[in-house]
A protein has these predicted regions:
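Extracytoplasmic
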Residues: 36-67, 181, 273-278, 421
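Extracytoplasmic gate region of multi-pass secondary transporters
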Residues: 55-60, 253-302, 306, 366, ...
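Glycine-rich segments within core transmembrane alpha-helices of 12-TM secondary carriers
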Residues: 144, 164-190, 407-421
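Conserved MFS/SLC helix-loop-helix module at the cytosolic interface between two early adjacent transmembrane helices
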Residues: 87-130
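C-terminal ends and interior cores of transmembrane alpha-helices
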Residues: 110-126, 326-345
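C-terminal membrane-cytosol helix-exit motif in multi-pass small-molecule transporters
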Residues: 190, 218-240, 452-456
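Hydrophobic core of transmembrane alpha-helices in multi-pass small-molecule transporters
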Residues: 115, 129-145, 346-366
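Central cavity-lining transmembrane alpha-helices of secondary-active solute carriers
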Residues: 76-94, 295-308
């Protein structure tokens, strides 16, 4: 009898034997365990994205509750969580092999309660300095780092041929936290939900009350619930354990840096647009109540990410990624035609429609590039181990470890887009009064990614899967 059967029934326990590439093992035991861990991971990651992007909904409302921050400062608050999130993704990407997926998921979800509670109190006190908001926004970045450890953890549970779909679901539905937050926050800030905990509203010109603290506090009970779910419901895989020394060599691979650049263009665009879209829309079309519509772009992008992984499993990640970058460049060019000039003209409907297309392609590309990473690093590692005369078991174990480390590190690079995009919009507006300068940079970058994808991966059919 396998040693894995008992732990599979006892959630939260360590599974000492895990062979997802064995069809019989996968059918009889593996699929059930992997699915349970995936469906606990998804809401934990979704909540993390809610917290990570809190300031995309809070910053635009700060002037309404009495704070006199400049537009550039507000853009900065939306951008900073991506800085800390990107930096923290590097160590987070190595945490699962060091501490275990169950323990780390529970810990990394639970600590997000801290910035949520603090932000709720801070927005109710107009004497709160800008420096305090900077600290809170940086703490929200811990939520963004969860993506690296979550994706690394799930990658250990699934066989190679199912990783694109599994990572697409985990990442895509997790990314949906951005749209969930941008949908829920405008609704709950109009309700007196937490009066018993000190929440009070600020009267608006139309006589309504704005309870901005609710945008942060609404996530606290859910974070507590899913922290417990992760602790008691997920499993540790003994085969996923690896020292830091075993994981670091992946940083020497040239493909790591190439794929980091491509992922920056896809996921970086998704998270950057998610962070900055509401503020950008407010500056270009001030009469539009953008928070009524802001959630839909991230929602489409999150769904597209799930689809991007599954489509890439069938058609090949390189092919999907290449076509996707062409579309991103086209839509970026179209965006110039939708903007007002000197505050005159422009079409919000066209602007919104083109941005939805950009969210869609950014989401698809996030899924397809992650599928490429998984395929590329598994093949590189297995070929290396076999060339050294290693066993199939060693090859599969090291391939899983290298792939998880690569996924985590590359996700850290991608998250930087969440800082650069809103900061680029803010700087362009401050210097020229228009976001056009930033948009030109994005367009050139997407065109460069088309060339890089084709030159490195697209010319050789053996790399297309």
């Amino acid at each position: 009898m396998s040693h894995s059967s008992a732990p599979e029934r006892a959630t939260g326990a360590v599974i000492t034997e895990w062979r997802p590439e064995d069809p019989a093992f996968w059918q009889q035991r593996g699929h059930r365990v992997a699915s349970r861990n995936l469906w606990i991971s998804v809401p934990c990651l979704l909540l993390a994205f809610c917290v990570w992007m809190l300031f995309s909904a809070v910053a635009v409302n700060l002037p309404k509750v009495g704070f006199n921050f400049t537009t550039d400062q507000l853009f900065m608050l939306t951008a900073l969580p991506s800085v800390s999130g990107a930096l923290l993704r590097v160590p987070y990407s190595f945490m699962v092999p060091l501490f275990g997926g169950c323990r780390w998921t529970a810990f990394s979800t639970g600590i997000l309660i801290v910035p949520c509670v603090w932000l709720g109190f801070a927005v109710q006190d107009t004497s709160t300095p800008f420096s305090t908001f900077i600290i809170i926004s940086l703490l929200c970045g811990f939520a963004g780092a969860n993506f690296a450890s979550s994706m690394a953890n799930i990658s250990f549970f699934f066989p190679k041929q199912k990783q694109g779909g599994a990572l697409g679901l985990n990442g895509g539905l997790g990314n949906m936290g951005v749209s969930v937050m941008q949908l829920v926050a405008p609704l709950v800030v109009s309700l007196s939900i937490f009066a018993a905990f000190g929440s009070h509203g600020v009267e608006q010109p139309d006589g309504s009350q704005l309870y901005l603290a609710n945008a942060a506090w609404i996530w606290v009970p859910f974070l507590a619930i899913f922290t417990l779910a992760a602790w008691f419901g997920m499993n540790e895989l003994a085969t996923s354990k690896a020292s830091l020394k075993e994981q670091l060599p992946v940083l020497k691979r040239g493909h790591l840096w190439i794929m980091s650049l491509l992922y920056l263009a896809t996921f970086g665009s998704f998270i950057g647009f998610s962070a900055g879209f509401a503020m950008l829309s407010k500056t270009q079309f001030p009469d539009v109540q953008i928070l009524h519509y802001a959630f839909f772009g991230p929602f489409i992008g999150a769904l597209a990410r799930s689809a991007g992984g599954a489509i890439s499993d069938r058609l090949g990640g390189t092919r999907v990624t290449l076509i996707n970058f062409v579309l991103m460049a086209i839509f970026s060019g179209l965006l110039f035609l939708t903007l007002p000039t000197g505050g005159v003209g422009g079409s919000f409907i066209a602007f919104y429609g083109v941005f939805l297309a950009l969210f869609l392609t950014a989401g698809l590309g996030s899924g397809s590039t992650f599928q490429m990473i998984s395929v590329i690093f598994r093949k590189l590692t297995m070929d290396r181990v076999k060339a050294e005369g290693g066993s199939d078991e060693r090859a599969m174990r090291e391939a899983a470890t290298d792939t998880a480390a690569a996924l985590g590190f590359i996700s850290a690079i991608g998250a930087i887009g969440g800082f650069f995009i809103p900061k680029a919009f803010g700087s362009s507006l401050a210097l020229t009064g228009s976001p056009v300068g930033a948009m030109k940079v994005f367009l050139i970058f997407y065109i460069a990614c088309v060339v890089i994808t084709w030159a490195v991966y697209g010319r050789h059919s053996k790399n297309k899967k």
